Amino acid sequence: PEEVWEQDADRMQDAGVSVVRMAEFAWSRLEPEEGVYEFGWLDRAVQVFTERGMDIVLCTPTCTPPQWMFHRYPEVIQVGRDGNKIPIGVRGHRCMSNLRYRDFCDKIISRMVGRYCDNPNVIGYQIDNELEANHCRCPECVSRFRKYIQGKYHTIDAVNRAYGNAVWSGEYSCFEEIEPPTAAVLQWQNPSLTLDYNRYASESTVDYVR
């Protein structure tokens, strides 16, 4: 609660804390409605620590998009390995490759950085939170995965040879036939396909961060 912020800050200072981090999961408070930004409360929180000479690391809230985004733009929801959109919980259920989601990320981050960039006590920004590989199977990710495979192997024959697809009659005739592993039992998937998908998912996250 805001009424104990100063008390907490004093105790942290007494304990020797010199740097704090904040706003990590606060997207719904920073943008309660699409395009409506409320940074007043964060201004006050930053001021509490600035007055005490403590440094601040601000965290982008991008790991936890607000509920209005999921309901208004369901295409930003991650698709799980069963081929269905994952149930909306409280965190981490967005597709990092979705362009609409990335646009919202750009907007909230630009607002945050533009507001606090001149505060000398704000010493840095944490990007997202505990980043994981983007294991999404939405149409955008399927398309990106196929392009990743094509860029790596160049020809479909090279894919078939590398994967040993002739063994299980799994030879592809074109890149459009390639799907990410979605079976409930991943042991039934071609391990080479699964490995390439995991590598793609990792690179997808790197691209998101950039």
Locations of regions flagged by a protein language model:
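Boundary/entry segment of secreted carbohydrate-active catalytic domains
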Residues: 1-4
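Aromatic-lined substrate-binding rim segments of carbohydrate-active enzymes
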Residues: 6-86, 109-113, 210
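Polysaccharide-binding and catalytic clefts of secreted carbohydrate-active enzymes
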Residues: 86-210
